[in-house]
A protein has these predicted regions:
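A eukaryotic "domain-start" boundary segment
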Residues: 1-35
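Hydrophobic, aromatic-lined core segments that form the binding pocket/scaffold
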Residues: 23-170
Length: 170
């Protein structure tokens, strides 16, 4: 469902070039990730401090991933697939100007209006949907992202997990 620009997570335009897969970025290209985080720190925060730049990157990332995921869960009873393998970033210079899903996959309850959609994973009940939400956030995303940021961009693990907790509570 379209929930507005802050809460919507569009599907990548397959005709548009310049997309990079999140799994590739966070698991295979430490130097590129370090360069992107450093560029963000300089451009938006006016700093070369690795910790501040990594925190700024984390906040921007959380806004584009957690808000749409939680909004879909609360408002539509859906859990969109935000695993790193399904997330894409559109590059612009040394940064990104868009975040999107590679495929429109989501988990939903049996009575969802789009339950018959080919990209829908039907879960039996609300407890299973909530378990899927936690799996998407932690196993499929932050459990891979935070170690990558710590390794390549010198992020603080504690600060990063605190930012995740704060964004989920927002």
């Amino acid at each position: 469902a379209e929930l507005g620009p802050v809460y919507d997570m569009p599907v990548r335009d397959s005709e548009q070039s310049g997309w990079v897969n999140a799994l590739s970025l966070f698991q295979e290209d430490d130097q590129r990730l370090q360069d992107i985080v450093a560029a963000l720190g300089k451009a938006f925060l006016g700093t070369e401090n690795h910790h501040l730049a990594a925190s700024g990157f984390m906040i921007a990332y959380l806004t584009r991933v957690v808000y749409p995921l939680i909004a879909q869960y609360v408002l539509e009873n859906r859990v969109i697939d935000v695993s790193l393998g399904n997330l894409e970033f559109h590059t612009k210079g040394q940064g990104f100007d868009a975040t999107a899903l590679g495929q429109p996959r989501f988990a939903a309850l049996p009575d969802d209006p789009d339950a018959s959609h080919s990209d829908t994973e039907i879960v039996p009940d609300e407890a299973a949907l909530y378990a899927r939400l936690k799996e998407q956030l932690f196993d499929g995303n932050f459990g891979l992202l935070i170690p990558a940021l710590c390794r390549s961009a010198k992020a603080s693990e504690k600060v990063s997990w605190n930012a995740v907790a704060a964004s989920c509570a927002h």
